Amino acid sequence: MEMRFKMIHENFNVSDLEVSLEFYEKALGLKEKRRKTAEDGSFIIVYIGNETTNFELELTWLAEHPQKYDLGEEEFHLAFRTDDFDAAHALHESMGCIAFENHEMGIYFITDPDGYWLEIIPVREGKTF
């Protein structure tokens, strides 16, 4: 029998949980699904997502790390496909969070409050949302 794996979540550590939650809900429609708070207050973990997939983004806030995280050379990202690319672009432009646009490829990237890159991709021919 072949061993199988299913991706279930990605973790981003954040410096301001409330600012991040507001950003992800406004920019990508991701809402809080569940939360775990340490008894001693040392951390809070919030899982966010939407109805289009079971995959979740885990936002982790650590009490002893109030500053933004060093993301190195930022050579990683999480991608989101949208069924209304033009409206998404207009929203992100109004939020001032577009970091890079690749017109030739028909994609762009936004950054969250901690500097994580998020790729925005339109639905392409032959692909489903």
Question: Across the structure, where does each feature detected by a protein language model lie?
Answer:
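Short, charged/polar surface micro-motifs in flexible loops or helix N-caps
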Residues: E51-F55, E64-P66, D84-D86
